[in-house]
Structure formats: C-alpha cells, structure tokens
C-alpha cells in the first residue's frame, strides 16, 4: 500500500517523543524561573528597589513563558500522527495481504503508544526525557571560547579535543590556565559563547542540559560542601531521592556504591567525622549511585594528605579499569598524569599540549616554562636513562622498582 509506505517515511518515532519531552521540560523550567522572578521583583517594587516599569518587564516575561509552555503542552503532532495511521488502517481491506494488514496494525499500536506517552509527559512536565548515545566519543569540545566579561581576556580560547568512552584523561595547568573554567563548561555551570560541548554525540544546549548531566558524576575539591545528611547512607540516598529512584531498589544501590569504594562498613557514620580520603570516597560513592558513564574529578585530591591522595588516585584507576568509566581529572598535581591515558595541558586559556603522559613529559623544559612541576618518578626515569639504564614509562614507584629488579 502506497499510503502505508509514505506514512513510514514521515511518521513520528520514539526519538521525536524524547525531543518533545526535552523541549517540554525546558519550557517548564523557563516558566517556573520567570514566574519566581516576577514574584521576587514584585516584592522588590513594593520596597522601592525597582521601578514599576521594570516590574512590568518581568511580568511580561512571565506571561510569555507561560504562553510558550502552554503552546507546547497543546502540541497536536502526536494526535495527527495517530489520526493519519488510523485512516490508513481503516482503509486497509481484506484484499490486502496479511503482511500489509499486520504492518498497518503495528504502526497503529506504536502511534497510540506515542500519543499516550506524550500525554503523560505533559502531566509529568517532560521529566522522563533521556539522551541516547549516538557515538562512542564521551566528550567532544569544539572551538570553545569564553570570557567572564566583555573587556576581560579569554578564559578559554578556541579549545578543541575529544575524550573517548573509557579513557582516563588528566587536564593539567597552573592557576589561571583555564582548566577550572573548562570544568565548569563540561558540567554546564557556564555556557559557551562560541563553540560547543557534545556528550556521546549530543550537542549540549540549555534545553537538554538536565538530560546531558545524567551521563555525568561530579566529585569536587571539598566534599564537606556536598554533605547534607547525618550519615553516609543518608548522603548517598539524597542524590537518589532527587532522581526519583524506586525506594525498593535504593538500599541495594547505596550498599553496592559504598562497597565499590570500600565504605560499606561506614554507612552509619557521620560524614564530617571521617578522614579526608574517606570523605572523598563517600563523594565518589554518591556519584556512582546514579551510575554515570563519565566521572569528573575537580581537584579532588588537592586537599588530601599523602595517604588519602594515593587512595583516591587508585580508586580513579579502578573506576576506569574495572568499571569501564570515563575519567576526567581536572588537576594541578603532575604526579596524577602518570595514571592517565591522555593528558591535556592548559595555559593562558588555550590547550597547548595533548598526548600520552610519556609524550607530554618529554617536553620538560616547556612544562617548566609554564610553571608545572615534573613528576619525581619521571625525573628518576630520566636520570636512569642518562646513566644508560633504559626503563619503560611507569605509573608509580612500585612499577619502576619491579623493572629495576628485573
């Protein structure tokens, strides 16, 4: 049947439904923010802090946002999609083959399901939207530029790179190099003024930011700022509750996440009474509970003592090797780059080097010129080489000692 063939080329799909949910959720958030701003500035106008004209401006923004949300809620595309296939199905007679009849029936069922889900998503404000993995490039940064103010220098200037799924990448640089700004870009705290960030092939926009963040887990420098519960268990549970995880599954998820970082026996302990390394383990467990594909460590070892520092670095390697997570570590700790698959060197807002650790460490004079210390292990390997003792690149001192013993 020609009409059925034509329908198959123009019909709406589950991807269209997901795109609808993303737009719906984005418009809902915009409406809430505009409405909250209006009521906040309404009070400010009463106190004489802003003029009536300014208040009218906020009121108009609120009205506009409500209309935009209402318009997308009244979208008829899924109803039209069902209407079209219903006509085709009803016009299909017994003269057609059983194959054609079955195909038309399948299309009708799919269209009904799409319409029902679209209707339900309106009630749920599009919260069920998800992004799918379109490729195996975990993070792709293209021509990224950012200034904190028009007359400021670029904090990021034409930065481009790719991080593949399952890679451990260290982003290194001194203070002011641009690595912290890059970190904020990756997690969506800042928006690019030029260029863009893609996660698994999805260009990140304000509309799909919430969905893109589901791929990410973040571990910050100071875990104390993340703790809100009276126990380790409560802190891990907090993130799950926010993501509307089934309560029946929550206990197992909490235990499994804690066990992955060796904290399963500390679930009843108060986080603030733990050591620095243990606190970071709790922060990692909280991130792992949501099962992200990508874990971003933002100066996660900089406030730890040597023991805690070493423990967290070992966990980061395990996350890559055993759990197949993509690891991005924003750091100024040059020793950490020895564990990485790839190193990105930032300076003056630009990416000045990218490559394997051993490739980057060959440029010792350049690294020193941009105020980066050479890892002690690398200096030892260099000294051995100068004495005619050739060794392979080692990730830690234990590996180097084993090579020397052989």
Curated annotation (Swiss-Prot):
Its main location: membrane. It is a peripheral membrane protein. It holds the Pfam family ABC_tran. The keyword rRNA processing does not apply. Its EC number is 7.-.-.-. It is an enzyme of class 7 (translocase). Belongs to the ABC transporter superfamily. Energy-coupling factor EcfA family. ATP-binding (A) component of a common energy-coupling factor (ECF) ABC-transporter complex. Unlike classic ABC transporters this ECF transporter provides the energy necessary to transport a number of different substrates. This is Energy-coupling factor transporter ATP-binding protein EcfA1. The gene is ecfA1.
